[in-house]
Amino acid sequence: MENVDTSRRGFLKSAVAASGAIMAAAAANAGIPASAVKSYEEEFDVVIIGSGFAGMACALKAGRAGLRVLMLEKMSVVGGNSAICGGNVACPCNPVQKAQGIKDSKELFIEDCLRDGLGINHTNLLATIADRCNDTIKMVVDCGCEFVPNHMLFEGGHSVPRSYEIKAGSGSGYIRPMHAELKKIKNVVIRTRAKFDDFIVSDDKSEV
């Protein structure tokens, strides 16, 4: 796996670069002017809205890097839709496939996704999934997630068996152990029943 700059400055720089376009688009149409805010009660390096797979993965990465993290969840329990999804995950060129002699490739995975997605997929993101899925599997297994051992599902839309089957039978098989891992990190704060209302932006809306 490639080296990642997890210093506070490096992490935040990467995060801003990755999300800047989305944040700017949202802030252009919404946002509370900074001049209207009288005081700040708390400060965090990273604020995560939602506690599904993406939110928890981000919180783990940032928390382990030593950043102060706040994760907000509007429901009374964490996980959102991620907790009730099927939970199986497609990962081309994984160790189980190789051990069972299943021939797969990044190109075949992308081809399958484009066909099933009617050609409107973002191929660069599909490539990222293919390149990083084995790192993702390792991360969740390290958190305590359990898959059916030595087994690949042959799911619809795929040319070969390439999907891991989560033992729990749903996304809760990820959410519960990831949540337990997050609770061990003292600089990560998780708040349920906490609805996100709006961004605070500079008066000219150039900064969030």
Across the structure, where does each feature detected by a protein language model lie?
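Beta1/beta-strand and adjacent pyrophosphate-binding region of the FAD-binding site
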Residues: 40-52
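A short, basic/flexible loop-to-alpha-helix module at the beginning of a structural domain
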Residues: 31-42
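Hydrophobic membrane-targeting alpha-helices
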Residues: 23-31
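N-terminal secretory signal peptides and thylakoid transit peptides that target proteins
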Residues: 2-19
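Aromatic pocket-lining residues of Rossmann-like dinucleotide-binding sites
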Residues: 62
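N-terminal Rossmann-fold NAD(P) dinucleotide-binding loop
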Residues: 55
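Residues that mark the start of a beta-strand
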Residues: 45, 67-68
